[in-house]
Amino acid sequence: DHPGVRDGTNIVLXKILPWGDEAYAAGG
């Protein structure tokens, strides 16, 4: 899990990549 990334970059990724949050939750 990458809280800092999920707070910023992953919010953007999530809008682009449907697996964005799952990928970062699993370790990036």
UniProtKB/Swiss-Prot annotation:
It comes from the Eukaryota. On the 2D-gel the determined pI of this unknown protein is: 6.8, its MW is: 35.3 kDa. This is Unknown protein from spot 154 of 2D-PAGE of etiolated coleoptile.
